[in-house]
């Protein structure tokens, strides 16, 4: 195997969207083209009992939303494609943000009836901050939606990125006839046996359709006043190619995939803490853990650390350094994924995502290196929780399961754990309410540990240096606690309590996370 050629084939990207824009459906269709599934399951399968291939966790199947980031791999057109399907629900932004650190491009799925929604905007900001290319798929043309020109204008105004339509819809909803493919200079037909037709046949096929005249006018306008196509601007994250289609009816998806693979970037390097970038073609293996997931196989109570390979080649059984602990580890039980199925992998290269079987060795953000290399990659973003709950085991006899469950789910980063300095009580922190629901559901379903949870409301969280801490600083307006790394932290009841503390202890420096 020529490693350099293998690395060149890799295309690793995440799919981002607002909930219900059709993200999981398009993932299914891409897997279908990659030959990984025989038929694309549909997310709304609550009545039929069929569930999306990429939504494997029990609570996701019940609710029809993605709450964990799945990783799936397939080969297509000479490329090895790694898709990371991110949680669409806003409460899981933490997991999504970390996932976006592990990819080289993003595909943004937009509901053409709704346009740019709040969650899409949030996720786009992260992608923009990273400077990676964004490809846009305007979905659900099988339903009535907004005017395509309006959608492009909104995209540019709200997200502040230039756009270039690769195709243009001919009608929509019941009147949807197909796509005018600007990039390939052909028509893609929605109805009938033929898939494509030449542009010259347009008047013959759609002459009586008022939509077709509008399409020709729109395209003339785009040619005169639209943005110029620039591969350089796409790779710099300054121009997003826009594709129209319908994931549900699998229309326009294959054309999108083929053009996407042509322009999506090869694996990029990753920054170390000293600012130097590790090149993917460096011969020495390196990677970082961007996610930990417990119980991917509930029968075995297992934990998988997801690793993005940054440079070199992974070989089964290799020894790696874990600079955070100063210790080493052996990578013998390693898998690659297709949602709920996995297979052991003997080697993988820069750009690939591998799953390392974990018995508690790894933490999110860990760097893996080989030989004399002991550097660390720049830290992944961490988030300050906004709402809190006290948590305890309902059954005193189940303390062992309770502690194991909390330890594993907290290491995943699904919720954050704090311990009251004075009472030793456990408190959970989260960005949104759904995280608590998922935590409770998984504690009961996966660890057989029922929990009692009582709301504490919103808190303003600040960390304090251990050397500055005096336990007398604790008052009725704050709770002194330790985080899971035993670092002291104050949970203030509101901003007023925080300001009061800052006035009283002007020399004490309080730290806020993202």
Curated annotation (Swiss-Prot):
Increases the formation of ribosomal termination complexes and stimulates activities of RF-1 and RF-2. It binds guanine nucleotides and has strong preference for UGA stop codons. It may interact directly with the ribosome. The stimulation of RF-1 and RF-2 is significantly reduced by GTP and GDP, but not by GMP. GTP binds at residues 17-24, 85-89, 139-142. Residues 8-268 form the tr-type G domain. GO terms for molecular function: GTP binding; GTPase activity; translation release factor activity, codon nonspecific; translation release factor activity, codon specific. It is found in: Cytoplasm. Disulfide bonds: none annotated. Keywords: Cytoplasm, GTP-binding, Nucleotide-binding, Protein biosynthesis. GO terms for cellular component: cytosol. This is Peptide chain release factor 3. Belongs to the TRAFAC class translation factor GTPase superfamily. Classic translation factor GTPase family. PrfC subfamily. CDD domains: RF3, RF3_III. The keyword Cytoplasm applies. Pfam families: EF-G_D2, GTP_EFTU, RF3_C. Its main location: cytoplasm. Gene3D superfamilies: P-loop containing nucleotide triphosphate hydrolases, Peptide chain release factor 3, domain III, Translation factors. One of its GO terms (biological process) is regulation of translational termination. It comes from the Bacteria.
């Amino acid at each position: 195997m020529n490693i350099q050629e293998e690395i060149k084939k890799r295309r690793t990207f995440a799919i981002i969207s607002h909930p219900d824009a059709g993200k999981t459906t398009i993932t299914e269709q891409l897997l279908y083209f990659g030959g990984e599934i025989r038929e694309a399951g549909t997310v709304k399968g609550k009545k039929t009992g069929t569930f999306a291939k990429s939504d494997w966790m029990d609570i996701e199947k019940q609710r029809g939303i993605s709450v964990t980031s799945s990783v799936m791999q397939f080969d297509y057109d000479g490329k090895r494609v790694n898709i990371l399907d991110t949680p669409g629900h806003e409460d899981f932004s933490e997991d999504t943000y970390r996932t976006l650190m592990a990819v080289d491009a993003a595909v943004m799925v937009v509901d053409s009836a709704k346009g740019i929604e709040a969650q899409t905007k949030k996720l786009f900001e992260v992608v923009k901050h990273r400077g990676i290319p964004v490809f846009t798929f305007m979905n659900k043309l099988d339903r009535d939606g907004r005017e395509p020109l309006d959608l492009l204008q909104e995209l540019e105004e709200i997200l502040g990125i230039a756009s270039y339509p690769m195709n243009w819809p001919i009608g929509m909803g019941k009147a949807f006839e197909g796509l005018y493919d600007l990039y390939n200079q052909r028509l893609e037909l929605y109805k009938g046996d033929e898939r494509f037709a030449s542009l010259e046949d347009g008047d013959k096929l759609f002459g009586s359709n008022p939509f077709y005249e509008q399409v020709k006018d729109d395209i003339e306008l785009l040619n005169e006043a639209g943005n110029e196509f620039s591969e350089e601007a796409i790779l710099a994250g300054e121009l997003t190619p826009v594709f129209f289609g319908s994931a549900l009816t699998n229309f326009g998806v294959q054309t999108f995939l083929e053009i996407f693979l042509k322009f999506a970037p090869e694996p990029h390097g990753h920054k170390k803490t000293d600012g130097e970038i590790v090149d993917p073609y460096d011969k020495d293996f390196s990677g970082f853990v961007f996610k930990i997931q417990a119980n991917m196989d509930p029968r075995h109570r297992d934990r998988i650390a997801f690793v993005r390979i940054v440079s070199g080649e992974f070989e089964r059984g290799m020894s790696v350094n874990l600079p955070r602990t100063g210790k080493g580890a052996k990578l013998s039980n390693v898998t690659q994924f297709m949602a709920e199925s996995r297979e052991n992998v003997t080697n993988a290269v820069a750009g690939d995502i591998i799953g390392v079987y974990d018995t508690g060795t790894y933490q999110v953000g860990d760097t893996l290196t080989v030989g004399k290399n002991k550097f660390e990659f720049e830290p992944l973003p961490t988030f300050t929780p906004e709402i809190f709950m006290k948590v305890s085991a309902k059954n005193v006899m189940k303390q062992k399961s309770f502690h194991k469950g909390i330890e594993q789910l907290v290491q995943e980063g699904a919720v954050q754990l704090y311990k009251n300095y004075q009472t030793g009580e456990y408190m959970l922190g989260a960005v949104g309410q759904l995280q608590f629901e998922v935590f409770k559901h998984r504690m009961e379903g996966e660890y057989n540990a029922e929990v009692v949870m009582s709301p504490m409301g919103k808190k303003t969280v600040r960390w304090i240096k251990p050397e500055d801490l005096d336990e007398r600083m604790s008052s009725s307006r704050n709770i002194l606690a330790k985080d899971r790394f035993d670092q002291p932290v104050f949970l203030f009841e509101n901003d007023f309590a925080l300001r009061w503390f800052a006035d009283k202890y002007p020399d004490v420096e309080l730290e806020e996370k993202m």
